[in-house]
Amino acid sequence: MTKIGKKIRIERIINRESRNTVIVPMDHGVSMGPIEGLKNLAETVNAVAEGGANAVVLHKGVVGFGHRGYGKDVGLIIHLSASTSLAPDPNEKVLVCTVEEAIKLGADAVSVHVNVGSKTEAYQLRKLGEISKIAGEWGMPLLAMMYPRGDGINQFDEKAVALAARVGAELGADIIKTNFTGDVESFRRVVDGCPVPVVVAGGPKMGSDEDILRMVRMAMDAGARGVAIGRNIFQANNPTKMTRAISMIVHDNADVSEALEFLKS
């Protein structure tokens, strides 16, 4: 029963034809406050849904504000982890929601954030293991946001990223979100070393639209199964068109020039 349940839910957060996904995380309100692009969640969810996003990531308290109730459906991933930028250690992620709560709120998947190499790594790994067990029992897909972060750690280093991704898979995640390592070859080794699908994180707002589209193209060429991009989508001049441009690369194998031409049209 749980196997078919998980299959059904996963198909709500991916494209059934390409088997890839465009996820738009909108969980930044806890860590960063009401930043640009997230002041009106309903408006932003609508914009990315119209652009073809497969799923959004929200915290439990704002699910109602992000529910469309009309038009194209968009998958719901409820984020279970949190920390704020004002904390003594923002890398210390704690659980603020349960799998059962997420199910009651209508989630299609849950996500957990782990900072590998942080001072509280042990706690975060233990909680990831616990959540993967519970999620598995309920047939709930688990997205693990795995980042190498801590004193003296280069969070874009290939070996560090590969380790973080592999840890998430080893502890039971169904999909891994992690940093791009800067080029196709190194990220391909990250993907090849992870036995579950990898989606690339967008990170901080980039300098240009072309920069983000180029990163997406390189990640897909390396074998990524999609993206989980927040600020570079919802803080774009036109979030709907940016979502569509990224979707063209992820689902239709468009090149950067094609996606950029659409974005500028």
From Swiss-Prot:
Source organism superkingdom: Archaea
Enzyme class: transferase
Catalytic reaction equation(s): 1-deoxy-D-threo-hexo-2,5-diulose 6-phosphate + L-aspartate 4-semialdehyde = 2,3-dioxopropyl phosphate + 2-amino-2,3,7-trideoxy-D-lyxo-hept-6-ulosonate
One GO-annotated biological process of the protein: amino acid biosynthetic process
The keyword Disulfide bond is assigned to this record: no
Active site residues per record: 27, 147, 177
Binding positions for 1-deoxy-D-threo-hexo-2,5-diulose 6-phosphate per the UniProt entry: 27-31, 147-149, 202-203, 230-231
InterPro entries given in the database record: ADH_synthase, Aldolase_TIM, DeoC/FbaB/LacD_aldolase, DeoC/FbaB_aldolase, FbaB-like
Enzyme Commission number(s) of this protein: 2.2.1.10
GO molecular function terms attached to this record: fructose-bisphosphate aldolase activity; hydro-lyase activity; transketolase or transaldolase activity
Pfam families referenced in this protein's UniProt entry, alphabetically: DeoC (PF01791)
Keywords in alphabetical order: Amino-acid biosynthesis, Aromatic amino acid biosynthesis, Schiff base, Transferase
Function: Catalyzes a transaldol reaction between 6-deoxy-5-ketofructose 1-phosphate (DKFP) and L-aspartate semialdehyde (ASA) with an elimination of hydroxypyruvaldehyde phosphate to yield 2-amino-3,7-dideoxy-D-threo-hept-6-ulosonate (ADH). Plays a key role in an alternative pathway of the biosynthesis of 3-dehydroquinate (DHQ), which is involved in the canonical pathway for the biosynthesis of aromatic amino acids.
Subunit structure: Homodecamer.
Homology family: Belongs to the DeoC/FbaB aldolase family. ADHS subfamily.
NCBIfam families: ADH_synth (TIGR01949), PRK07226.1 (NF005556)
Annotated protein name in UniProt: Putative 2-amino-3,7-dideoxy-D-threo-hept-6-ulosonate synthase 2
